[in-house]
From Swiss-Prot:
Catalyzes the conversion of 4-hydroxy-tetrahydrodipicolinate (HTPA) to tetrahydrodipicolinate. It comes from the Bacteria. GO terms for biological process: diaminopimelate biosynthetic process; lysine biosynthetic process via diaminopimelate. This is 4-hydroxy-tetrahydrodipicolinate reductase. It comes from Maridesulfovibrio salexigens (strain ATCC 14822 / DSM 2638 / NCIMB 8403 / VKM B-1763). It is an enzyme of class 1 (oxidoreductase). NADP(+) binds at R35.
Length: 260
């Protein structure tokens, strides 16, 4: 039995995670956390609940923390978890390179897993897309689009950035040098190596990502569509089960969990 702590338990993702843990045969809801002023009703879950991470984590030693919040909140949580020893599964997106470097430092002290998207399908794409890049060669232009609900605060999505990065690297390019997150006005023709990553926001779309390979006389589109947040929740809980048996030393990702 793996004990789990859900951060942001009353949010869209947190609520889904709580429900999935409650329905699981091998997971136990050890604790839940929310921001001050948002904790009303949490005590009905029958576990440790609170707004102070230090206080909550001290009461549930060894429990795996699952966090889908914000970069600042995640880093604060990691600082506390590195003292209490709780492993942490991170689904937070929108981190800067500097923030990611801090996460890697914390991973030396406590088991940490980080993935912008925890669905099995997206992580299969991370393996498939580089193969397509290599087979098609540089005669095909590469682009990426993503669609998310109108409440998403970061753009482009962490998943789109990760997919585009793996495509760029497969062609021997440095992503930060070729990325194009917007096009506006008379900007001239598309350069040979640039890789556009464009975002659409609206409605209640859980998450669509499409990679484009546009060549002479044809194009290939590879799309992943998430129909439910439960896809991400189950992936995060799969990671939590796995992380509970790991040691600190490296920043783990979904490739480690899936052994691919």
């Amino acid at each position: 039995m793996t004990d789990v702590v859900i951060i942001g338990a009353k949010g869209r993702m947190g609520d889904t995670l709580v429900r999935c843990v409650q329905q699981s045969d091998d997971l136990k809801l050890a604790a839940v956390m929310e921001r001050s002023g948002c904790e009303e009703g949490l005590d009905s879950l029958g576990c440790v609940c609170g707004t102070d991470a230090q206080e909550v984590l001290t009461k549930v030693p060894g429990a795996v923390v699952v966090d889908f919040t914000s970069p600042a909140a995640t880093l604060k949580l990691l600082e506390i978890a590195s003292v209490t020893g709780n492993p942490v599964v991170i689904g937070t997106t929108g981190m800067t390179n500097e923030e990611l470097a801090q996460v890697e430092e914390f991973a030396k002290k406590v088991p940490v897993f980080l993935a912008p998207n925890m669905s099995v399908g997206v992580n299969v794409l991370l393996k498939v897309l580089p193969e397509l890049v290599r087979m098609l060669g540089d005669a095909y232009d590469m682009e990426m689009t993503e669609i998310h609900h109108n409440k998403k605060v970061d753009s482009p999505s962490g998943t789109a950035l990760k997919l585009a990065q793996c495509m760029a690297e497969a062609r021997g390019l440095v992503y930060d040098e070729v990325k194009k997150h917007s096009r506006d006005g008379i900007i001239g023709a598309r350069t040979k190596d640039e890789l556009g990553v464009m975002a659409v926001r609206g409605g209640d779309v859980v998450g669509d990502h499409t990679a484009y390979f546009l060549g002479p006389g044809e194009r290939i589109e590879v799309t992943h569509r998430a129909h439910s947040r439960e896809t991400f929740a189950q992936g995060a809980l799969r990671a939590a089960r796995w992380l509970s048996e790991q040691k600190p030393g490296k920043l783990y990702d979904m490739a480690d969990v899936l052994d691919v």
